């Protein structure tokens, strides 16, 4: 485009990663290996980007800290991909794009402004995408097996209430009293697990999450799936031992895996 800042918009499952891989190959063919770097608002998202594209990545806050402390910056001819850009604060994006411009690099913001927004003051990604007449947007969703799911996901993205009717018609939503739904959700999760399916149990409050985790762990101990002989107490008062799955809630680069290549990230999922 000739611009130093471009955007790529796409709903979940539309092929943004595939598009970025194609762009990576084309850019490196012209500018050389290692000329594409990646950033993302969270450490987990940055790691996903690194795994998907095979490039060096960092989260935006850490990169900015490295810039302030060590003078880290960009190089002329580099392509800086900022993934999940709708989650990045406007000030963060402004700082990074100005540094890229000064260095002669190009920035590509990738994401979906119809999904979650930044915790910080945000909206820059949506503003740029909506302000331009030639913003590229991926519109075909490839992630789902059933055609109705593709349509419903896009309706949900655009805030169209008929999406709810689709999910109800296909028995994807179950309603009930607040007192009974935790039991219903837990039993559905347990049924899936007993069938060998991958199932995720999500609750609205920390209290509900803690209680459901206690219940699930007690059942797994009863089934002898878990051994409670050696365990440690977690922050919410629950316990964990060998075989348990936990989620870490802070970034701590001092806590590394045995290989030394991976470290504890906020939102990281681990098996003890």
Residue ranges and their predicted role:
Residues 1-3, 23, 102, 110-271:
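Conserved helicase motor core of P-loop NTPases
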Residues 6-168:
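ASCE P-loop NTPase helicase motor core
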């Amino acid at each position: 485009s000739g611009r130093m800042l471009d955007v790529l918009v796409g709903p979940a499952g539309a092929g943004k990663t595939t598009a970025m891989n194609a762009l990576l190959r084309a850019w490196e063919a012209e500018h050389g290996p290692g000329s594409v770097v990646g950033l993302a608002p969270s450490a987990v998202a940055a790691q996903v980007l690194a795994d998907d594209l095979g490039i060096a990545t960092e989260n935006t806050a850490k990169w900015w800290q490295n810039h302030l402390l060590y003078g880290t910056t960009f190089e002329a001819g580099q392509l800086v991909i900022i993934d999940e850009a709708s989650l990045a604060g406007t000030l963060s994006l402004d700082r990074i794009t100005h540094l890229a411009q000064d260095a002669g690099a190009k920035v590509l913001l990738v994401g979906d402004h119809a999904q979650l927004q930044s915790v910080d003051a945000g909206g820059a990604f949506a503003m740029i995408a909506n302000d331009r007449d030639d913003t590229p947007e991926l519109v075909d969703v490839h992630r789902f097996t059933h055609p109705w799911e593709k349509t419903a996901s896009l309706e949900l993205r655009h805030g169209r209430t008929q999406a709810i009717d689709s999910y109800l018609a296909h028995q994807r939503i179950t309603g009930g009293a607040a007192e009974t739904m935790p039991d219903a959700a837990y039993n559905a999760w347990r049924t899936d697990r007993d069938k060998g399916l991958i199932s995720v149990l999500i609750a609205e409050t920390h209290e509900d999450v803690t209680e459901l985790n206690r219940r699930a762990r007690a059942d797994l101990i009863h089934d002898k799936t878990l051994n409670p002989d050696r365990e440690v107490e977690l922050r919410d008062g629950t316990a964990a031992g060998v075989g348990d799955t936990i989620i870490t809630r802070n970034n701590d680069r001092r806590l590394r895996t045995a290989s030394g290549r991976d470290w504890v990230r906020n939102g990281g999922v681990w098996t003890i």
